[in-house]
C-alpha cells in the first residue's frame, strides 16, 4: 500500500529549520537545528 507523505519545512523565529514529515500521523516530526552564530 502506497501512502502519501507530506514534507514541509518551516522556519521559526529563532531561525531553526523545522522539517515536518507526516505519514498519516503527525507524530513523525523531525527537528533540525540550523547553524547558529555564537
From Swiss-Prot:
Alphabetic keyword roster: Disulfide bond, Protease inhibitor, Serine protease inhibitor
One GO MF term: serine-type endopeptidase inhibitor activity
SUPFAM superfamilies per the UniProt record, alphabetical: STI-like (SSF50386)
Oligomer and partners: Heterodimer of an alpha and a beta chain linked by a disulfide bond.
Function according to Swiss-Prot or TrEMBL: Inhibition of trypsin.
Similarity comment text for this entry: Belongs to the protease inhibitor I3 (leguminous Kunitz-type inhibitor) family.
Protein name per Swiss-Prot or TrEMBL: Kunitz-type trypsin inhibitor beta chain
Amino acid at each position: 500500500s502506497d501512502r502519501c507523505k507530506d514534507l514541509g519545512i518551516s522556519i521559526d523565529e529563532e531561525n531553526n529549520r523545522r522539517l515536518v514529515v507526516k505519514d498519516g500521523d503527525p507524530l513523525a516530526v523531525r527537528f533540525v537545528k540550523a547553524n547558529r552564530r555564537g
